[in-house]
C-alpha cells in the first residue's frame, strides 16, 4: 500500500528548498526577467519486451544502456498482508523476510556470499497486495543471479534457527513500536477505515509472531507463490532474447503446489466515521489521525485525489503544514494525503500536538478540509503542486532499479506498463475543478474518523465538539 508519509530525503530536500521562504520569513522579490519554468519532461515508456512462459509467469524486459548491471523484480500477487489470516496479522512480513535466509541448497551466509560474488544482492519485501523478490548483479553475472533469485523465491527452507531469530527480532521491534503513539494511532486508523477487510491487518501482534513455525511458513509459501500470479521484470544491460532464455532456465519448470489464496475482495467505501480516544496516561501531547475510505489505484479519481491530498498536506508548503506549524505553532509537522491499493484506499491526516491545543488543531484541520472542497485551488498553487508531484515521480524513476520496481508495483495494483509514461501527462491534465471535487468527495469533514492517542484527563473536554468518543486503553 502506497504510504504518503514515506517521503524520500531527496523529496523532502526539494520541498524544503521550494518553500524556504515559509521557514525563513517573507520572501525577497524575485528578479522580473527570470525565465519561465520549462515544461515537465514526460517519462518515456521504455520498449518493453514481453513473454508469458508456459506456466503462466509473465516476463517483462526493459533493456537499458548505461552501467553494466541488471536488476530483477519478481512480483507475486495475493502474497502480501491481505492474504494473512484474521488471527495472523503481519504474517507476510516474516515470510518475506525469511525467503533469503536459507533455501534447500544454501544457508543464509552462502546466499549472501554468492550474491556478493555476483556484484549485487537479493532480498524481499511485502505490501498489502503482494510480495516482491528483488535482486541485482553485474551484467556479466545476469544468469547466476537470476538463478539465485529463483532459488530464493521458489525453494525457501525456513530453517528453525532463522525463524526463531526472526521472531525474536520481530518481538523486539513490536515492543518498541507499541511504545510509540503513532503505531497505536495507525493501527486504529486502518481498523476504522477497513473494518474486517484484510487491508486492516498489516501490523503484527505478539500472538501472530509467536504462532509462526517453519511448517506454517512452508505451507503458506506454497499457497501464495504461484507462477501464474507472478511477473518477472528484468531491467538493465541485457537484450530481451537473452533475458527470456534466462527466465525460462530459472523459472520454466516452476509449478504451483497447494491451494492458492483467494483474491482480495473490494475494500468497503462506506465506513461509518468513528471517534476513538486511545488512553496514554501522562502524555503531554496528542497524536491525531483523521481518515476515511477512498479509491483503488486504478480508479479515475486516483490522480486528482493525489493532487488534492498534496495541496492539503503532502509537502512542507502544504496547507495544513503552513496552518498548524507556521501560523499557529501547534506542531512540528502536519500532513494529509491519499493511499491507494489494488482493491481500495483511504485518505488520512496526521499531526502530534500539545495537549492544550488538541481541539484547536482539529478545528484547523477541518477548516482546511472544508476550504479545499469549497473553493478552487488558485492556479499558481495548483501548478506548483503538479510540478512537485510530477518532478518527484521523474526523479524517483531515473534509475533502472526504480523503473523495474515501479513497473512491478503498478502491476500488483492492476496498472498497465504504459502507466509508467502516462502518469506525468495525467497529472498535468488535472484542473482545479477536479481537485475541488475530489476534496469535497473524500476529504469532507463529516466523512472522517478521528483517532486521538493521548491523556483523556487532559484532552477529553476539548473533543466534545467532535462527537462522543469511545475511550480505549
Description of each model-found segment:
Residues 187, 197, 214-250, 446-449:
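Non-catalytic, conformational "gating/processing" segments within enzyme and secreted inhibitor domains
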Residues 101-105, 136-167, 315, 335-396, ...:
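M16/insulysin-pitrilysin zinc metalloprotease superfamily fold
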Residues 32-49, 173, 191-230, 262-267, ...:
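Histidine-acidic residue clusters that define the catalytic metal-binding segment
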Amino acid at each position: 500500500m502506497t504510504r504518503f508519509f514515506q517521503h524520500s530525503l531527496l523529496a523532502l530536500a526539494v520541498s524544503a528548498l521550494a518553500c524556504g521562504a515559509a521557514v525563513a520569513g517573507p520572501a525577497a522579490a524575485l528578479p522580473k526577467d527570470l525565465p519561465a519554468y520549462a515544461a515537465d519532461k514526460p517519462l518515456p515508456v521504455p520498449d518493453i519486451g514481453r513473454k508469458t512462459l508456459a506456466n503462466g509467469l509473465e516476463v517483462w524486459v526493459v533493456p537499458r544502456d548505461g552501467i553494466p548491471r541488471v536488476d530483477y523484480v519478481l512480483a507475486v500477487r495475493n502474497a502480501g498482508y491481505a492474504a494473512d489470516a484474521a488471527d495472523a496479522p503481519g504474517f507476510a512480513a516474516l515470510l518475506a523476510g525469511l525467503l533469503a535466509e536459507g533455501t534447500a541448497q544454501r544457508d543464509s551466509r552462502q546466499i549472501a556470499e554468492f550474491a556478493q560474488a555476483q556484484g549485487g544482492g537479493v532480498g524481499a519485501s511485502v505490501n498489502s497486495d503482494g510480495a516482491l523478490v528483488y535482486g541485482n548483479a553485474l551484467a556479466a553475472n545476469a544468469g547466476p543471479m537470476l538463478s539465485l533469485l529463483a532459488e530464493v523465491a521458489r525453494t525457501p527452507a525456513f530453517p528453525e534457527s532463522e525463524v526463531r531469530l526472526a521472531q525474536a527480532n520481530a518481538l523486539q521491534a513490536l515492543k518498541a513500536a507499541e511504545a510509540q503513539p503513532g503505531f497505536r494511532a495507525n493501527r486504529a486508523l486502518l481498523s476504522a477505515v477497513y473494518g474486517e477487510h484484510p487491508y486492516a491487518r498489516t501490523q503484527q501482534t505478539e500472538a501472530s509472531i509467536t504462532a509462526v513455525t517453519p511448517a506454517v511458513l512452508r505451507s503458506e509459501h506454497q499457497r501464495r507463490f504461484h507462477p501464474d500470479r507472478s511477473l518477472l521484470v528484468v531491467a538493465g544491460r541485457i537484450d530481451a532474447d537473452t533475458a527470456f532464455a534466462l527466465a525460462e532456465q530459472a523459472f520454466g519448470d516452476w509449478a504451483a503446489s497447494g491451494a492458492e489464496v483467494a483474491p482480495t475482495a473490494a475494500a468497503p467505501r462506506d465506513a461509518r466515521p468513528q471517534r476513538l480516544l486511545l488512553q496514554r496516561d501522562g502524555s503531554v501531547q496528542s497524536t491525531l489521525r483523521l481518515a476515511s475510505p477512498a479509491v483503488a489505484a486504478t480508479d479515475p479519481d486516483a490522480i486528482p485525489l493525489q493532487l488534492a491530498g498534496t495541496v492539503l498536506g503532502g509537502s512542507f508548503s502544504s496547507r495544513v503544514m503552513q496552518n498548524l506549524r507556521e501560523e499557529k505553532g501547534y506542531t512540528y509537522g502536519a500532513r494529509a494525503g491519499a493511499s491507494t491499493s489494488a482493491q481500495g484506499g483511504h485518505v488520512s491526516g496526521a499531526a502530534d500536538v500539545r495537549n492544550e491545543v488538541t481541539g484547536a488543531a482539529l478545528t484547523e484541520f477541518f477548516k482546511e478540509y472544508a476550504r479545499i472542497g469549497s473553493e478552487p485551488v488558485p492556479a499558481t498553487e495548483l501548478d506548483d503542486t503538479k510540478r512537485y508531484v510530477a518532478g518527484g515521480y521523474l526523479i524517483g524513476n531515473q534509475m533502472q532499479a526504480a523503473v523495474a520496481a515501479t513497473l512491478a508495483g503498478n502491476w500488483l495494483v492492476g496498472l498497465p506498463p504504459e502507466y509508467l509514461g502516462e502518469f506525468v501527462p495525467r497529472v498535468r491534465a488535472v484542473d482545479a475543478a477536479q481537485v475541488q471535487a475530489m476534496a469535497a468527495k473524500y476529504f469532507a469533514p463529516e466523512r472522517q474518523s478521528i483517532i486521538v492517542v493521548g491523556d483523556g484527563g487532559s484532552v477529553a473536554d476539548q473533543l466534545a465538539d467532535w462527537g462522543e468518543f469511545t475511550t480505549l486503553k
